[in-house]
Amino acid sequence: FKKFIDSDDHIKRADYLAWERKYWDLKRMLKYLPTDQRALYNARQILMSNSYGVDNAIAKVPQYLKKDPGLEFDRLRWRNRRGRLESSLEILYKNANKTERQMIRPDLWWEQRKSVARTLIYKKRYKTAYKISSEHSLSSGPSFAEAETTGADNKTP
């Protein structure tokens, strides 16, 4: 298959596997990626699988790839699972004005955004929860309806 599949195809497959959270398959195909992309997807794989060396893996990602929406998402999810609310908010604020297309998978971003918003509501930080809920970048579908409803529920009088 080497003559039919080029590095762009491998990058697309790696991106698909990463967004689908198939980190074991992603890990097995890292060797087919160009060096810079290998560093990016290795960091994503480590974040997804809760492996050791997260900081080291992220440090190896080239600067121009550190703003990759997938890496940002995996970092958000990793921080959110560990209860790091303020650093989760930092990532959400940094990605607040991106379009649905720039987010790649805004539906998955919404799940993390919703989780952070609920934590904020629990902590009685209603205005911040509303801000986080309303900046969802969705335009249609069930997640859009939920995001719009959640944002409306968080409005303070």
Question: Model-flagged regions — what are they?
Answer:
Residues 1-157:
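Alpha-helical solenoid repeat scaffolds
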